[in-house]
């Protein structure tokens, strides 16, 4: 197990993550305390954030040719 030092950064306490523990491509972390542990994990989008995503094309659910045949299937 590795250890890191805690230092003061203004009014906050901080640590430096070792390079091999970097969250590559992540700009925001969620921090949670569980007992005597502190867990860092990437912030996940909320369901509400889907409203801001680009909408699907109008023909997204249009009739399309079946690409999988029913051959070999049986009725339940």
Curated annotation (Swiss-Prot):
<keyword id="KW-0238">DNA-binding</keyword>
<dbReference type="InterPro" id="IPR047976">
    <property type="entry name" value="Anti_VapB2-like"/>
</dbReference>
<keyword id="KW-0843">Virulence</keyword>
<dbReference type="InterPro" id="IPR007159">
    <property type="entry name" value="SpoVT-AbrB_dom"/>
</dbReference>
<protein>
    <recommendedName>
        <fullName>Virulence-associated protein VagC</fullName>
    </recommendedName>
</protein>
<keyword id="KW-0614">Plasmid</keyword>
<feature type="domain" description="SpoVT-AbrB">
    <location>
        <begin position="4"/>
        <end position="45"/>
    </location>
</feature>
<dbReference type="InterPro" id="IPR051734">
    <property type="entry name" value="VapB_TA_antitoxins"/>
</dbReference>
<dbReference type="GO" id="GO:0003677">
    <property type="term" value="F:DNA binding"/>
</dbReference>
<dbReference type="InterPro" id="IPR037914">
    <property type="entry name" value="SpoVT-AbrB_sf"/>
</dbReference>
<dbReference type="Pfam" id="PF04014">
    <property type="entry name" value="MazE_antitoxin"/>
</dbReference>
<comment type="similarity">
    <text>Belongs to the VapB family.</text>
</comment>
């Amino acid at each position: 197990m590795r250890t890191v030092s805690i230092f003061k950064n203004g009014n906050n306490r901080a640590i430096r993550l070792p390079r091999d523990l970097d969250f590559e491509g992540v700009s925001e972390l969620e921090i949670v305390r569980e007992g005597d542990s502190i867990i860092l994990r990437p912030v996940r989008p909320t369901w509400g954030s889907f409203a801001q995503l680009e909408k699907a094309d109008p023909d997204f659910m249009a009739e399309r040719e079946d690409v999988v045949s029913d051959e070999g299937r049986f009725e339940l």
